[in-house]
């Protein structure tokens, strides 16, 4: 392009037909004027319709119709110098080699002007088109040409069609790059009454259109958007995710809009001219969806009210409900770039206060929450991270997110004031305090003499305090040393860890140790409830023989002052003697039919008959057919067949479901009191029959020989079981692997699972 002498010449390359157009002659033919303003040529012509075709030697063809034809030519980047309002031009566009400005002053007329300039050999760097805003007074029209710049050298020109309405400003955006044209008109209207001012403030208006453009309102006048409904609502971005059109508006003073309310214009209404006109008349341009949102942090409510006048607006990006975060880009919404507008006006504060008052009284306030009014008008509660201010829709997501802050997780809730011990468990903290008491037993009184002692608990969003009162807890003392603790479980572990060597016979239930097996056997009765010792004078029963002697001596001794006339019993109290006489003289109305035993009620008599005189065991085991007197005994026995071996020997890998069997195992295998030794293998035994049975293994003779097969053994009980289970008809269910017989199929199945499980697998 060359400029000089007040003329503008357009020249083609040497390989093409030369086309020359004198601008002054062209303008004069249109009854217009042209002048030079600095580096630009300003052309003014009456408002008309101009269509540019391919220029030949015949000249220029004019058509006063309203249609625009497309002429192929290189893309031109256009820059507009704005007179009335400021225009933001991206820096990338300023690097273009060519910029053309046209200032068209209109006369009175209703036509539309479309101008095109044809050029050749114009090479500009590939850039992105820019949208400029041009405004002017009434009766004056200014036009902006926008094209998508590319590096194509072929002569291509895209003509544009501009629709003019009775508005002050307008901008036309033509999508390039092969995308079907979608015209979005941004229209601003001023109020008729200048005295009436909107009480709402201006907020950033974000629109995600088909090509991802961002339009920003620069003035103080509210914006209305009318979008072409022919385009798809959902597109895909560079990451393959869906991009949704989102428009966020501020509410105007005359709009009766509720926070969280939405307004949707259907496609049918959009295609109807009356519906669109009605929306325009009501100062509401059509849009697919308008969302009024507000976010409020309850902890910042008072600060927002105090800073309300100097803080006009604030924006935060938040995840929409139902969307997920990418693992690498946690703060990015892969579905759409949605923004929430935070309104700090007094009206919004009132709405948020009403929402907060409806909160349940019993709800904990340990977690900070933010109230979000969603698109459906319902309040949504999110949980913000107090470290990075991210928000989550549940406490579980917040806890999972807190793992990204390892420095915070390293902090412990409880810290000892006497040392550097820290922990997150309250029980461990108390146990640690007790360790200080054991170490500094001299200072035991000083440990709890203070009225209160406070330990700070640092929670993620609040601070609580743990108060220890001066009341001493109940202490459990070890009978073998000076150890004491407030928990029985700690004492049991202490006995196992410290005193297990001195007291090898340890109870599997409570961990208490004993020196002799008889002591352990006597102690086990306290857990099972067995009372084998019964008083011969009364119904008293006990688990220890010494307790029975004490009872007889104290209740039935010969030196007691009150003696019974009917029996040799004596009592130390007259009331006890009278109670005995009442029972003896006829209050025991339930007489046992088998003996002289009498009971005061039928249940006691039934228990006596079952336990003493009945050889029948009504409660039978379904697996081994063993009978029991009571259902509780049967239930305890059934655990053996269920395979729940919860009792394990602490000396070896032996496990059993019966604590008595475990005690017998410990006594027979792991006790040091094994005085009977085998002379050949030096193995010890507690009883003579066990040693005698063991000695048979060294003779080499199988004294028990089966007469039906080649089976032989030194164990009489084993030989008896062999004959009954293998060679009798009482066991019809035979094992397929060892030919052992069983009475029931369940016994056979249990045998196979126990002895032939590897064969099955």
UniProtKB/Swiss-Prot annotation:
Sorted UniProt keywords: DNA-binding, Isopeptide bond, Metal-binding, Nucleus, Repeat, Transcription, Transcription regulation, Ubl conjugation, Zinc, Zinc-finger
Q: What is its main location?
A: nucleus
Pinpoint the Glycyl lysine isopeptide (Lys-Gly) (interchain with G-Cter in SUMO2) cross-link: 224, 235, 296
Q: Which GO terms describe its molecular function?
A: sequence-specific DNA binding; zinc ion binding
Keyword DNA-binding part of the UniProt annotation: yes
- Does Nucleus appear among the keywords? yes
**Residues the record lists as binding Zn(2+):** 564, 567, 580
Gene Ontology cellular-component annotations: nucleus
Record InterPro entries: C2H2-ZF_domain (IPR050752), Transcrp_activ_Zfx/Zfy-dom (IPR006794), Znf_C2H2_sf (IPR036236), Znf_C2H2_type (IPR013087)
Q: PANTHER family from the entry?
A: C2H2-TYPE DOMAIN-CONTAINING PROTEIN-RELATED, FINGER PUTATIVE TRANSCRIPTION FACTOR FAMILY-RELATED
What's noted about domains in the record? The sixth zinc finger contains a Phe residue, Phe-584, instead of the final His residue normally found in C2H2-type zinc fingers. There is another His residue a few residues downstream, His-587, but this is not involved in coordinating zinc. Despite the His to Phe substitution, the zinc finger retains the ability to bind zinc using a tridentate metal-binding site of Cys-564, Cys-567 and His-580. The zinc finger also has hydrolytic activity against 4-nitrophenyl acetate.
Family assignment from sequence similarity: Belongs to the krueppel C2H2-type zinc-finger protein family.
The entry describes its oligomerization and partners as: Interacts with PHF8.
Q: What is this protein called?
A: Zinc finger protein 711
Q: Which organism is it from?
A: Mus musculus
Its encoding gene is what? Znf711
